[in-house]
A protein has these predicted regions:
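Bacterial N-terminal signal peptides that target proteins for export
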Residues: 1-11
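C-terminal motif of bacterial Sec signal peptides marking the signal peptidase cleavage site
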Residues: 18-22
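Surface-exposed edge beta-strand/loop patches
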Residues: 25, 181-238
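Bacterial Sec signal peptide processing site at the extreme N-terminus
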Residues: 26-32
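Extracytoplasmic low-complexity, Pro/Thr/Ser/Ala/Gly-rich segments
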Residues: 33-117
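Short, solvent-exposed loop/turn segments enriched in Ser/Thr/Gly
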Residues: 120-124, 195
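Asparagine-centered strand-capping/turn motif at beta-strand->loop junctions
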Residues: 127-132
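The feature marks short-to-medium sequence segments in extracytoplasmic or secretory-pathway proteins
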Residues: 135-188, 235
Length: 238
């Protein structure tokens, strides 16, 4: 677990309640499109697809195929490294950079948003693969990844921009589960993979740590805390 930080980032909705008018704005996910959407994509490491009998299974994947409930398992970006646990791996990729189209979701103690329109952001992609010999039952959270720069001053995790157009342009999804896929547990069979991504402030050349938490599901689809695993990867954002 991380130690406490010197500053506190507050949700913008809470800041508004406290009367800090400078932080009103986007606190809930919404679909937006923007003519100013701009994505710069670094060289991508592609994994050749294996010969299969269906187009869906022919997508590039980290390992094996994609379960029916997964939105994607596509490998996008340049690999930063792999966080390896007992029976699973999470490959982490830096995908592309863009410009924030709106205010972020958090503010500092003075009421100033942490992310503002025009700020540079970077997209990363997480690919979870079952490397074990048995099915891996998962909850709705699938796998949690907490990314933080070494000099991140807040106790909360890093802020992000909720904009579906930016995610689409980057070629990543913000949710690993296809809508309407049913109830947990979601089974990840041996060799299967699932992917999702996120964005945060772009600080090129900055050391960053990715803390990965995987808590399998029990038969009812609830978190099985007795089997919780935490692993980490240290890298540098380009």
């Amino acid at each position: 677990m991380r130690t406490s930080r010197s500053a506190l980032a507050l949700p913008l909705a809470l800041v508004a309640v406290l009367g800090l008018s400078a932080c009103s704005g986007d606190t809930a996910p919404e679909e937006t499109t923007s003519a100013s959407t701009s994505v710069e994509t670094p060289e991508t490491e592609e994994t050749p697809a294996e010969d299969t009998e269906s187009e869906e299974e022919a997508e590039p994947a980290a390992s094996g195929d994609k379960p029916a409930w997964a939105a994607t398992n596509e490998v996008v970006g340049t690999q930063l490294g792999t966080a390896e646990g007992d029976g699973f791996t999470v490959d982490i990729y830096q995908v592309s950079t863009a410009v924030a189209t709106k205010t972020g979701q958090f503010a500092d103690e003075s009421g100033k948003p942490i992310l503002n329109p025009g700020d540079p952001i970077v997209f990363v992609n997480y690919v979870l693969t079952n490397t074990g010999d048995a099915d891996l039952p998962l909850t709705y959270s699938i796998v949690g990844v907490d990314a933080r720069y070494a000099d991140w001053p807040y106790m909360q995790g890093m802020d992000s921009i909720v904009d579906s157009a930016l995610f689409e342009a980057a070629g990543v999804v913000d949710s690993p589960i296809t809508p309407g896929s049913g109830e947990a547990p979601f089974i990840l069979a041996p060799g299967q993979s699932v992917a999702y991504g996120e964005n945060f402030k772009h600080q090129p050349g900055s050391p960053i740590e990715f803390e990965v938490t995987l808590t399998p599901a029990d038969a009812a689809g609830d978190l099985n805390h007795d089997l919780r695993q935490e692993v980490a990867l240290s890298a540098t954002i380009a």
